[in-house]
């Protein structure tokens, strides 16, 4: 029997408790594929904003809600009406003086969805991964109170979780620990820091952050 499992996300000092939610009745889907066609991400908009990831037509990440909660109560992603859609191909040469190659090419396909209200979300599909980022065109200062980020799996896969070592102040630690290898259904209800890996059978899915300036700020928690 398949067990639906959810990983909730905590950003910086914010802990979110997120559950599965049904898709909106009025949904518009946008599909983005990697350059080699092996990875595909399907973004759904309507009453909410969600995405799912497929590898060789197998769903490895089920529909997972994303969004922002602003300090003024605005819910970015809820009732998400797309006002503009832009697509482009990207090939960036990245210098890597400390890698075994002096440079490498990061190639992807990008989908930019501008949402009503001065916000938007950009998705990128690489041959070996998918990324997304929220942005705003609002001229004034914006304070983000919470971020919604779900990672929903269709089966009770094996996860590799590095839990926090500080139970009293779980976000105050050295980000060093051994990995606990466990089915998602047996995961402890405590914060785990990144990277986290889930063995989906045919592929392994690893959760990571980008554009970090200091210590990691993302934590996940099994729900």
Tell me the role of every PLM-derived stretch.
Residues 27-223:
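N-terminal accessory beta-strand-rich subdomains and adjacent acidic, glycine-rich linkers
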Residues 1-11:
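Bacterial N-terminal signal peptides that target proteins for export
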Residues 20-24:
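Sec/Tat signal peptide C-region and signal peptidase I cleavage site
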Residues 10-19:
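Bacterial N-terminal signal peptides
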Residues 2-3, 19, 35:
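Intrinsic-disorder/low-complexity regions
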